[in-house]
Amino acid sequence: MSEVNISASDVRELREKTGAGMMDCKKALIETKGNLEEAVDFLRTKGLAAAAKKAGRVAAEGLTAAKVDGLTGVVVEINSETDFVARNEQFQNLVTNIANLAINVKDIEELKAAKMPNGKSVEEDVVENIATIGENLTLRRMEVLKVSEGAIGSYVHNEVASNLGKISVLVGLQSSAKDTAKLEALAKQIAVHVAGNNPQSIDDSGLDQALVERERKVFFEKSKEEGKPDNIIEKMVEGRIRKFFAEVVLLQQNFLFDNKLTVAEVIKNAAKELGAEIQITKFIRYELGEGIEQEEKNFADEVAAVMKG
């Protein structure tokens, strides 16, 4: 096969079109016999192949997003490998566009198939962004919240751009109150409270009973070790369980904006003022990377693994 003559100007043009390295551009032009368009496709394919390798790395950074449209809200989480990417405008636009679509779908599978503004599916667009951004990206989860009447409050903590940040919260208030502005303001305050206090459930009944029993057992054993008489251990355990509920149950927590009142008391006062019942139907709190286990390896372990392998 005869040597293909590749000009420096072709290499430069291909680099400008793709942002790929000089040597990669030269190799692509040689492989495609100097055809610039085919060389672009060659590099794109190569980029996507590299992205497939990146998929083995843990993506625990990134962004969460909250979007509200009337009486419907959605929270999404999209992960990257480094915090640096979260400040990348291209990644921020990707997350925003996905959140805008998520509000109209029912689950993550439907979201992956939804069409982005560029005509590609969400799943396809994420893969292309893996290639161009150069990190593994994962559309991890989404959840929709709806109320039939009332208000939805949203709050994003540590915002890096509009509605994008480390923690995203939605709170649904069901109410027939006519003053929607005050209802929305209350929903927003409760959303801020949820971000800061991280409740586990709205009320007692929503708590995982296995968790409650585990706490009860710990308190019981601790009281026994302290040498307390059996006749008062049960009272002490019940007192500690009540304190535990006050720490993790939303309605029993002291309100972030007025710690002399519980959230339940704040809602009761607002209902009286607005002349209609108010009920928290649901809250969603996404904290970036929660529950993702990051595998830690040191350099010596990595070398040993390669030598074995």
UniProtKB/Swiss-Prot annotation:
Compartments reported by the entry: Cytoplasm
Sample GO molecular function, one term: translation elongation factor activity
Highest taxon, organism lineage: Bacteria
InterPro entries per the UniProt record, alphabetical: EF-Ts_dimer_sf, Transl_elong_EFTs/EF1B, Transl_elong_EFTs/EF1B_dimer, Transl_elong_Ts_CS, UBA-like_sf
Region of interest called Involved in Mg(2+) ion dislocation from EF-Tu, as start-end residue ranges on this chain: 82-85
Pfam families associated with the record: EF_TS
Keyword DNA damage: no
Entry keyword set: Cytoplasm, Elongation factor, Protein biosynthesis
Record field: transmembrane: none
Annotated GO CC locations: cytoplasm
Family affiliation: Belongs to the EF-Ts family.
NCBIfam families documented for this protein: tsf
Annotated function: Associates with the EF-Tu.GDP complex and induces the exchange of GDP to GTP. It remains bound to the aminoacyl-tRNA.EF-Tu.GTP complex up to the GTP hydrolysis stage on the ribosome.
Protein name: Elongation factor Ts
Native organism: Rickettsia bellii (strain OSU 85-389)
